[in-house]
Amino acid sequence: MNALLRFTIENFRSFAERKSLVLSHTSLDESCSSQPFLRVCALYGANSSGKSNLVNALARMRYIILNSVKVNDGEDLEYEPFLLSDKKNEPTLYELEFILSDKQYRYGFSNDSKKIVQEWLYCVNPNNSEIPLFIRDHEGIGVSEKDFPEGVDMEERTNDNRLFLSLVAQLGGSLAKKIIGFFSKSINILSGLETDDYLTFSARMIKEEKNVAALMKNFFKRVQLGFSDVTTRTQDFDAQSLPDNMPEELKKLLVSNLTGKKSVSILSVHGCYDSEGNLMENRTFPFDEMESEGTKKLFEISGPIFDTLLEGKILFVDELDAKMHPLLSRELVRLFTDESINTEGAQLIFTTHDTNLLS
């Protein structure tokens, strides 16, 4: 089982002081779930209240971790401190407490534009006592030979602007590789405002993953989107379909890059009925032309949603309710709160303005 328990940031964009998003049941009635963490967390607030920056902070932490292996010695790091106080010259801090393969860890680091200032990794016992696996500060990197042997003798091989965890993973450290994998495979971050990027992923799941496709289609029927089915059509690239008035250089570039490639079109299936309500035939229509913006968004993010549910992942969605009817947003949330559907302990964290989702 994998899960997110707490995310902490300090001195990032609009967050000057240390703030934490807590998803554990530490102060809640644990009887409300069979698992010790929240399946759903909604972040409410007015515009410019920092909701999106919290999601952006996790995205930034994830980016630094996954790209640290590519950072050259002396190369600047991503760094956006709070600019309206003397903290503008201090490091930004990121920390994540999480469950990975049923074990709990606390990993974090702080950085400015030039270097990793601090970095730490702890294993957390069931009684909440902590075992330091390694600690990095201005004096160097201290590694536990007993509890983190894969990091021994690698301390001096780490550049100032590179994460120690990343180096150990690159050199084959098993736990370090698992933690890097947790950030790359178990955490997904979506924008609810720009969902076009997820269309291909959702279409591929409909086309190739029959079990997932059945779940997605059943969900579409349950929320009564108006179509009876959704299908895909694969086509070879046809240069003749390019507009006649397209600039010749652009046309040549597209032909060069796309010849031999296939495109996937999404079609919605609608029933045609007679005056007595009897089905006469089914007709297919281009999905992006016939359906509403809310329906298109729901389909576009349905792939990541069901991938998260089936794999027990963690999904962050900024502006979940944008362009979508409140009832559709509520049904998406219910997928995660219903333990008969969310059998793998997947988590949904989202920002919203819709207080109706509180119910």
Give short role names for the model-derived ranges.
Residues I9, L96-L100, C123, H270-E276:
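Short acidic, glycine-rich loop/turn motifs
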Residues I65, V264-I266:
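A generic "structured core" feature
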Residues M1-L66, S275-S359:
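Switch/communication elements of ASCE P-loop NTPase nucleotide-binding domains
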Residues Q240-S263:
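Mixed-charge, low-complexity intrinsically disordered segments
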Residues F15, S101-Y105, K115, N128, ...:
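Short acidic/polar mixed-charge low-complexity motifs
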Residues R106-M246:
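Electropositive, glycine-dotted interaction segments
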Residues M1, K87-E90, L258-K262:
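A short catalytic or substrate-binding loop motif that flags glycine-/basic-rich loops and adjacent residues
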Residues C41-A42, V55-Y107, D112-I116:
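Conserved P-loop NTP-binding catalytic core
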